[in-house]
Amino acid sequence: MFSIIQNIEKEQIKKNIPVFRSGDTIEVKVWVIEGSKKRLQSFEGIVIAIKNRCLNSSFTVRKISNGEGVERVFQTHSHGIEEILVKRKGLVRKAKLYYLRTRTGKAARIKERLN
């Protein structure tokens, strides 16, 4: 039974996902359907959490839009994601950056990882 589930999950998993970690600034291009139109929408922000659960893997991206914090959770292997681009690598010491929710301005900055 378990091997059947694993075989089905292997077929569904995307292979072209770049390596990124918490603290990285990424741009996610997502297909959005509005009425009968289908277009690509870009969402750029800092990765504040990653959950690795095989096919149920997800990551949370946070950005500031018009002074308001906006968070969006993406399923890593979703068919709605066209591509993920890593813009900047961040230097952080925690896996979950939920403390950024309470910080604004310069306090919410993350140092860049140079390697």
UniProtKB/Swiss-Prot annotation:
InterPro entries: Ribosomal_bL19, Ribosomal_bL19_CS, Ribosomal_bL19_sf, Translation_prot_SH3-like_sf. Gene3D superfamilies: 2.30.30.790. One of its GO terms (biological process) is translation. GO terms for cellular component: cytosolic large ribosomal subunit. The keyword Amino-acid biosynthesis does not apply. One of its GO terms (molecular function) is structural constituent of ribosome. Keywords: Ribonucleoprotein, Ribosomal protein. It comes from the Bacteria. HAMAP family: Ribosomal_bL19. Belongs to the bacterial ribosomal protein bL19 family. NCBIfam families: rplS_bact. This protein is located at the 30S-50S ribosomal subunit interface and may play a role in the structure and function of the aminoacyl-tRNA binding site. This is Large ribosomal subunit protein bL19. It comes from Buchnera aphidicola subsp. Acyrthosiphon pisum (strain APS) (Acyrthosiphon pisum symbiotic bacterium). The gene is rplS.
